[in-house]
Amino acid sequence: MLGVGDKFPEFKLKACVDTTKDMDKAFADIDNSSYSGKWKVVFFWPMDFTFVCPTEIAAFGKLNSEFADRDAQVLGGSTDSEFVHRAWRNDHEDLKDLPFPMLADVKRDLTSDLGVLDRGAGVAQRATFIVDPDDVIRFVSVNDLSVGRNPQEVLRVLDGLQTDELCPCNWEKGDETLNV
């Protein structure tokens, strides 16, 4: 698995970006240069139409404006197709108005390059990456497939990384950093 300090791999994936009936607006090509110069929060879930996954995705959606205020683009994805993403978004009330792209890694290239493809299940692990504007991975977290992650904690870590200071345990934006 790629870790902190590694370069985030190049990619080009289809994404579901809208639930409109106009198929030209429902999908987009997203690649590593789509959000050049921005922080990126890239997270993966195992499968669409499951139970834990929509709780996390909706939570990231609710915090999207907080991430945007920090000049960070949220990108979520799984190994499902963009069409499955769109069907799920249309079917699930909490996902209809997601403000970020749902990446479709159907060939499993990005999840393999990152080292977060669960070989046994053939799906993405529940992984989260914070990537800086230079495309360097600054944070990685992987949860068991059965346990959802905490998007608020991802936001807290992003805040800490953006200080370029030493942040103690349980530090939150606005708290003092360590002076050494």
List each language-model region with its residue ranges.
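Chalcogenol-based redox active-site neighborhoods
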Residues: 1-180
